[in-house]
Amino acid sequence: MIILKSQHEIEAIRKACQVVAECHRTIAPLIQPGITTNEIERVFEDIILKHGAKPYTKGYKGYRYATCASVNDVIAHGFPGSKPLEEGDIVTIDTVAELDGWLGDSAWTYAVGKISPTAEKLMRVTKECLDLGIAQARSGNRIGDMTSAIQQHAESNGFGVVRDLLAHGIGRDLHEDPNYPHVGQPGKGPRIKEGMVFTIEPMITEGTYRMTIDDDGWTARTLDRKLAAQYEHTIAITAEGPQILTLQ
């Protein structure tokens, strides 16, 4: 069941989302060759706690960290670690903050120093996919209008769209309805209504969209071990159009 939020509830979610946005604003200039994802983890957790919020993923279904840190061929749910990032890497940092019982969720892919033209194109197209999806997130449209725009743009640029990891509604729970992949057909899927709050988070791959899960039960990698990128915002549907609650 899709839970529609009041304006008051949307503002409460926005406060949690802005904690997450501050994490990303703070870390962006710090991501350079030599930094570790453990260090990024500490920066994010410190900011979340400073605001009186909680790092929601820490302890979620046994997950042990405040962030997911996904490097190069890791699509999502990578663990922070002590290995320094290297020139040419790309890294996606995803975090969820809980503030006063409401959740905010955002992921962003960062370049580590100078990256390859392929990685640059992948990051650019993935961000464009996010923007195209948001543009279709209007009351009266359907989820398929968003996802088809994302899929068409990614595939027309020669990239894959991950099917097995989903975007989701969000509020007091992390995974509310609708849960949906970033592929589809225009005019299909649930109708978008004012008061809906959900993520748009395309995961785009250099090669195949197919993936594997590491033995740790979490880390999702591209099957062909080529690069993956992701950009995620939490948005609210209003009479005026989509509002980006995690705007940085």
Language-model regions, residue ranges each:
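Active-site neighborhoods and metal-handling regions in enzymes and metal-associated proteins
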Residues: 1-248
